[in-house]
């Protein structure tokens, strides 16, 4: 039986012209965006499994991206994912597992590190209080030390910017001093501006000399790698007081016409500040038209840096007690320098060379420890310009370590320093070479690499030698006897340089250094009397000058000049 046919009802026609109005049917259905790039070849594809979640999808893309080109995509994925629904697993039972404490026993050169538990001899580093005494000894301290050794390849994995950049730590250092809430920022300057300064200063003039020194043992010049000489741990007291705690500077501040007082370690850092990478700070006191540049007790000026300018400088490991952390390497380098300086001298009473005055920091009646031989020479430098209304003179305390005699039997001052190698396995990271295998045949290349990795430290040593007026610098190469033992070292060789020649090789400009010092002094002399702190930014090449309350660092401050003048 044929079904009936019925015409649909037509909308009433209001006018006799035009089509009828369309009824609003389906107006509440949301619009699904689409793209012409969507694959529309199949209505439904039941042969490809939908990925469970994002983690599985990323894993498949990483492992099979080259084999399976077509990935699962929801219709409309090319334009928007608002209406594309992807099923995900229930993550209510998901939990994070901490795997940071898992010890990996097998490692490779590209992955991870190894935790080694070694028993070493602890060094005894003593720092005095207000007198500025800094002593070191080779004492033994028992104790187990967990050492974290890594070639730097166990870092975080991420986007690859360059060769092995994926495993390098981000170098974020902490400031040497915490900026207080009551500190006021006065000025800041970038290193690019400091490097353009220039001032031709007069040659330093000796004002007075204190202490005594011994002759240099020339047998150290004959040391070779095959005839390695062990570094001895000698108990000697070393003094490195800050400026305002120096009784000689206190006397000169009252009687001389100098208006800037500073020590050679602080002055050399200011003159070489554009080469510095690690953070540091200097306390500046402006009092009655005179400036005093001080260091904080136990601060960066009491220790030496290691590979500060290297491309991959030492970083703080997870275990900060490791022997290759920056702090441990700094203490080790200071310990090596002090012992090498004492061992390289012939300590005989007949050959002792006494300066006009005794050591101003040592009192034999109150202290019984043996004193390290040092000569303290106070020198005056004229930094005045023709346009200055008042002369600007700088008084600096310099140091000499020993002496040699020329063919005319005249005494010539020398400076004795030491470079240290802490782990030959890090040579591929820092760009250096193994000293024990290359020092004999490529001594020039070894020293050139050290000038690159320790540019700031060597530049400071050169400036200190030029300020003291020494004739020669003796630089020793000291390496660990065992890469895991930071207490036993061997002397592999000694090289001698003229300070002026070394400055020329390092492209070190004294006129630029004097320009930096004069610029900072001019800024501080224009400020009212008070205390200021010059801070090197820990992560950027910037110097900042802060005004601080008078009682800042008061626990480390020495006697004031007014008190010394009335005493």
Curated annotation (Swiss-Prot):
Leader sequence segment: none
Ranges for region RNA gate: 300-314
Cited InterPro entries: eIF3d
Annotated keywords: Cytoplasm, Initiation factor, Protein biosynthesis, RNA-binding
Pfam families with a match to the protein in the record: eIF-3_zeta (PF05091)
GO biological process: cap-dependent translational initiation; formation of cytoplasmic translation initiation complex; translational initiation
Keyword Transmembrane in annotation: no
Subcellular location: Cytoplasm
Ranges of Gly residues composition bias in the record: 128-142
Complex formation: Component of the eukaryotic translation initiation factor 3 (eIF-3) complex. The eIF-3 complex appears to include tif32/eif3a, SPAC25G10.08/eif3b, tif33/eif3c, SPBC4C3.07/eif3f, tif35/eif3g and sum1/eif3i. This set of common subunits may also associate exclusively with either moe1/eif3d and int6/eif3e, or with SPAC821.05/eif3h and SPAC1751.03/eif3m. The eIF-3 complex may also include SPAC3A12.13c/eif3j.
PANTHER family to which the protein is assigned, alphabetical: EUKARYOTIC TRANSLATION INITIATION FACTOR 3 SUBUNIT 7 (PTHR12399), EUKARYOTIC TRANSLATION INITIATION FACTOR 3 SUBUNIT D (PTHR12399:SF0)
Functional note: mRNA cap-binding component of the eukaryotic translation initiation factor 3 (eIF-3) complex, which is involved in protein synthesis of a specialized repertoire of mRNAs and, together with other initiation factors, stimulates binding of mRNA and methionyl-tRNAi to the 40S ribosome. The eIF-3 complex specifically targets and initiates translation of a subset of mRNAs involved in cell proliferation. In the eIF-3 complex, eif3d specifically recognizes and binds the 7-methylguanosine cap of a subset of mRNAs.
Protein name: Eukaryotic translation initiation factor 3 subunit D
Source species: Schizosaccharomyces pombe (strain 972 / ATCC 24843) (Fission yeast)
Organismal lineage: Eukaryota, Fungi, Dikarya, Ascomycota, Taphrinomycotina
């Amino acid at each position: 039986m044929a079904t009936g046919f019925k015409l649909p009802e037509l909308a009433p026609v209001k006018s006799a012209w035009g089509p009828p109005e369309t009824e609003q049917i389906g107006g509440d259905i949301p619009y699904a965006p689409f793209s012409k790039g969507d694959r529309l070849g199949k209505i439904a594809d039941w042969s490809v499994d939908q990925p469970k979640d994002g983690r599985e999808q990323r894993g498949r893309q990483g492992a099979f991206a080259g084999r399976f080109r077509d990935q699962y995509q929801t219709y409309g994925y090319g334009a928007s994912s608002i209406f594309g629904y992807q099923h995900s697993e229930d993550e209510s039972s998901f939990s994070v597992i901490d795997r940071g404490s898992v010890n990996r026993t097998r490692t490779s050169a590209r992955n991870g590190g190894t935790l080694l538990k070694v028993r070493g001899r602890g060094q005894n580093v003593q720092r005095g209080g207000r007198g500025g005494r800094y002593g070191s000894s080779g004492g033994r301290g028992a104790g187990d030390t967990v050492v974290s050794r890594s070639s730097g390849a166990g870092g975080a994995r991420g986007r690859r910017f360059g060769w092995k950049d994926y495993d390098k730590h981000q170098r974020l250092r902490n400031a040497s001093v915490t900026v207080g809430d009551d500190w006021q920022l006065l000025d800041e300057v970038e290193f690019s501006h400091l490097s353009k300064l220039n001032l031709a200063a007069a040659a330093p003039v000796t004002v007075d000399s204190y202490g005594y020194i011994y002759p240099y043992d020339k047998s150290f010049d004959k040391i070779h790698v095959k005839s390695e000489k062990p570094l001895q741990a000698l108990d000697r007291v070393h003094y490195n007081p800050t400026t305002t705690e120096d009784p000689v500077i206190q006397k000169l501040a009252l009687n001389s016409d100098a208006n800037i007082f500073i020590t050679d370690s602080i002055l050399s850092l200011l003159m070489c500040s554009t080469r510095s990478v690690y953070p540091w700070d200097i306390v500046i006191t402006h009092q009655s038209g005179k400036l005093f540049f001080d260091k904080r007790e136990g601060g960066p000026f009491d220790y030496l840096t290691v590979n500060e300018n290297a491309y991959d400088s030492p970083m703080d490991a997870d275990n900060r007690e490791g022997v290759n952390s920056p702090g441990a390497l700094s203490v080790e380098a200071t310990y090596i320098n002090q012992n090498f300086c004492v061992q390289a001298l012939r300590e005989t009473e007949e050959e002792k060379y006494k300066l006009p005055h005794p050591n101003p920091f040592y009192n034999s009646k109150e202290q019984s420890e043996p004193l390290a031989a040092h000569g303290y020479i106070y020198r005056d430098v004229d930094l005045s310009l023709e346009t200055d209304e008042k002369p600007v003179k700088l008084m600096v305390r310099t140091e000499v370590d020993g002496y040699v005699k020329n063919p005319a039997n005249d005494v010539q001052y020398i400076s004795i320093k030491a470079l240290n190698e802490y782990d030959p396995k890090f040579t591929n990271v820092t760009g250096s070479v193994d000293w024990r295998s290359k020092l004999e045949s490529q001594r020039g290349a070894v020293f050139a690499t050290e000038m690159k990795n320790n540019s700031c430290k060597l530049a400071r040593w050169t400036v200190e030698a030029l300020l003291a007026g020494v004739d020669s610098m003796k630089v020793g190469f000291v390496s660990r006897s065992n890469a895991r033992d930071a207490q036993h070292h061997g002397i592999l060789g000694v090289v001698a340089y003229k300070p002026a020649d070394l400055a020329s090789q390092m492209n070190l400009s004294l006129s630029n250094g004097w320009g930096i010092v004069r610029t900072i002094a001019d800024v501080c002399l224009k400020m009212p009397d008070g205390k200021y702190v010059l801070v090197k930014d820990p992560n950027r090449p910037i110097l900042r000058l802060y005004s601080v309350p008078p009682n800042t660092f008061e626990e480390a401050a020495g006697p004031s000049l007014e008190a010394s003048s009335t005493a």
